[in-house]
From Swiss-Prot:
Gene3D superfamilies: 3.30.60.30, EF-hand (1.10.238.10)
Keyword Chloroplast listed: no
Entry keyword Nucleotide-binding: no
SMART domains: FOLN (SM00274), KAZAL (SM00280)
Organism (species): Bos taurus
Gene: SPARC
Residue ranges of every copy of the Follistatin-like domain listed in the record: 71-93
Pfam family, one: Kazal_1
Family affiliation: Belongs to the SPARC family.
Protein name, per record: SPARC
Role according to the record: Appears to regulate cell growth through interactions with the extracellular matrix and cytokines. Binds calcium and copper, several types of collagen, albumin, thrombospondin, PDGF and cell membranes. There are two calcium binding sites; an acidic domain that binds 5 to 8 Ca(2+) with a low affinity and an EF-hand loop that binds a Ca(2+) ion with a high affinity.
Keywords attached to this entry: Basement membrane, Calcium, Copper, Disulfide bond, Extracellular matrix, Glycoprotein, Metal-binding, Secreted, Signal
Domain of life, per lineage: Eukaryota
Length: 303
């Protein structure tokens, strides 16, 4: 447990900028496990707070003012596409040739798709996905997790019940760590700081550590109120493109992609959260998955 917490706290990436959503896909195929890239970021950073662009396969191209010397300079394309000029010297986004992607430095750059195929890097994956645009295969193809594909064992019912215990505790600890280190870093808003301050100053708070699930379960019962805000906060961190009260597959990716290799119940957990099977996870579904009572689910806590 300690290993995956450390990994998540060290994750880094590039910018999340996807203005359109992608629903949760059907994930019936067998997928496999991996080791993910670790980069230098502030200790305590949430993987969805740092900028993670590896997972935005739903982003649209955005056009800005064309610079005369280089029309492509301010013409941004989504992952898998590059800017080229047409016969009128107008910039346009075209699919990137996978062979033009930088050579991977090591295994940590590899990614696994949901059809269980390993790609040398996210660049290779998105370039390949782009060439399949408009096809059924391309629509279903997603980046599943970071690292080369490996066998991921089935998630047993008993293991599934343990997953939210660890996840809840981790969310609380991430917030406390951000609060402790947030002097001039603007890691939290003032409203968020006020909420977390109460948790931080509570003497009954279970300190971060590799605790047995029995202790985590007891702590949730005894200190239930400490967990309400962290669960809402994480939903807000994920619900960004667009901010609509629902989590799509693309919005979940920054959290689930690094988790899957280390927590094999990740995919099944998020699937069970989607109670109405509409391929999106609403706030009430998300909070319910973490054991938050219906009366305590409040959209105003998503700040």
């Amino acid at each position: 447990m300690r290993a995956w917490i450390f990994f998540l706290l060290c994750l880094a990436g590039r910018a999340l900028a996807a203005p359109q959503q992608e629903a949760l896909p059907d994930e019936t195929e067998v997928v496999e496990e991996t080791v993910a890239e670790v980069a230098e970021v502030p200790v305590g950073a949430n993987p969805v707070q740092v900028e993670v662009g590896e997972f935005d396969d739903g982003a649209e191209e955005t056009e800005e003012e064309v610079v005369a010397e280089n029309p492509c300079q301010n013409h941004h394309c989504k992952h898998g596409k590059v800017c080229e000029l047409d016969e009128n010297n107008t910039p346009m986004c075209v699919c990137q040739d996978p062979t033009s992607c930088p050579a991977p430095i090591g295994e940590f750059e590899k990614v696994c798709s949901n059809d269980n195929k390993t790609f040398d890097s996210s660049c290779h994956f998105f370039a390949t996905k782009c060439t399949l645009e408009g096809t059924k295969k391309g629509h279903k193809l997603h980046l599943d997790y970071i690292g080369p594909c490996k066998y991921i064992p089935p998630c047993l019912d008993s293991e599934l019940t343990e997953f939210p215990l660890r996840m809840r505790d981790w969310l609380k600890n991430v917030l406390v760590t951000l609060y402790e280190r947030d002097e001039d870093n603007n890691l939290l808003t003032e409203k968020q700081k006020l909420r977390v301050k109460k948790i931080h100053e509570n003497e009954k708070r279970l300190e971060a550590g590799d605790h047995p699930v029995e202790l985590l379960a007891r702590d949730f019962e005894k200190n239930y109120n400490m967990y309400i805000f962290p669960v809402h906060w994480q939903f807000g961190q994920l619900d960004q493109h667009p901010i609509d009260g629902y989590l799509s597959h693309t919005e979940l990716a920054p959290l689930r992609a690094p988790l899957i290799p280390m927590e094999h119940c990740t995919t099944r957990f998020f699937e069970t959260c989607d109670l109405d099977n509409d391929k999106y996870i609403a706030l009430d579904e998300w909070a319910g998955c973490f054991g938050i009572k219906e009366k305590d689910i409040d959209k105003d806590l998503v700040i």
